[in-house]
Amino acid sequence: MRVLVISGLSGSGKSTAVRVLEDEGFFCIDNLPVQLFPTIIDLVNKAQETVPGVALVMDIRGRDFLKGFEKIFQEIDDAGHTIEIIFFDATDEVLIRRFSETRRRHPALESGSVPEGIRYEREQLSGLRRLATLVIDTSELNVHQLKEMVLARVKGEAGARRMTIHLQSFGYRYGIPLESDLVMDVRFLSNPHFVPELKPLSGLDPGVRNFVLEKPETTQFLARFEGLLEYLLPAYQREGKSYLTISIGCTGGRHRSVALVEELRRFFDRAGIAVKVSHRDMEKG
């Protein structure tokens, strides 16, 4: 099993890294005594549910448990697990500024200044830093760049910029989906609802699909909307967005929006982008 030990200075970005790992399916535990690492790893390894790995946070809050970690790590390695230590760091100036912005006291000292806390923390974690597989200096990174760097380490460069799309149809009659990032209203298209033989069918039916897609206005709309998506998706990815919900709506969510979502699915498939499709209101119309 792959084991990631997440460590580093307070305010350097560990919490952001853990959230990224949780999104990738890692089993994450914060502030666990190092002596319990082998037990947790063994339990997760024996569980029925498959996970890509375990991420364990180890920092100054567990100062009483920092001793003897090298022996524990060797025990984990001897058990056949791949252990990686990712250490997050930043300059003193940047850390001081971050603490000032959040108005938090430094967790390393009950009393004393933030600079004193940083110096003490560096000293306490120096041995762990020396063992690090990777040191990430976040001084010049924004949160999106940090997410990309963590993903690049976890999934490889090819996976760092992958985006998952949730493409869904809906009916305005039942309200706009609250989770939507992009909403497209296609009620301007000809409505199969008013064709007697098509009314009882859905947009999954070839007859309804042909009725909707063969109209010139549909062809023009798809060309423009797909062009917009080709522009927007890389921009969203540059900002660190890994999951995008696109909602396509018609009156009842049964005919036009369903047919268009299925056609857009093919667009994403051709582009090699992972897509999840759902039809929220198809059975209501």
Curated annotation (Swiss-Prot):
Binding sites annotated in the UniProt record for ATP: G8, L9, S10, G11, S12, G13, K14, S15
Species, as recorded: Geobacter metallireducens (strain ATCC 53774 / DSM 7210 / GS-15)
Keywords: ATP-binding, GTP-binding, Nucleotide-binding
Binding positions for GTP per the UniProt entry: D59, I60, R61, G62
Name of the protein in question: Nucleotide-binding protein Gmet_1286
Function according to Swiss-Prot or TrEMBL: Displays ATPase and GTPase activities.
Tree of life domain: Bacteria
GO MF terms, alphabetically ordered: ATP binding; GTP binding
Record-stated family: Belongs to the RapZ-like family.
